[in-house]
From Swiss-Prot:
Keywords carried by this UniProt record: Antimicrobial, Disulfide bond, Secreted, Signal
Classification of source organism: Eukaryota, Metazoa, Spiralia, Lophotrochozoa, Annelida
Disulfide bonds: C25-C32, C47-C51, C61-C69, C79-C81
Entry GO terms, CC: extracellular region
Entry protein name: Neuromacin
A GO BP entry: defense response
Entries under Pfam families matching the protein: Macin
Subcellular location(s) per record: Secreted
Signal peptide bounds: 1-23
Family to which this protein belongs: Belongs to the macin family.
Keyword Signal listed: yes
Amino acid sequence: MALLNKLLCFALVFMIFGEFVTPDCYEDWSRCTPGTSFLTGILWKDCHSRCKELGHRGGRCVDSPSKHCPGVLKNNKQCHCY
């Protein structure tokens, strides 16, 4: 039930803010983005696990200022595999 509530909240946020977000925002988004990090482990794997799944030794979140959506994706981070 808690998962369903989180998914409904996530969908509602996307519907409300979707109008303010350009399609290019997706290029800046990652599993490390602070605004959606609460869904890590529920809807997607964390950075380290995803990189291992892709055949890398691991991964970590690094600062990556948003190029396309600086007003929406503040303090943006992206997953970098090593």
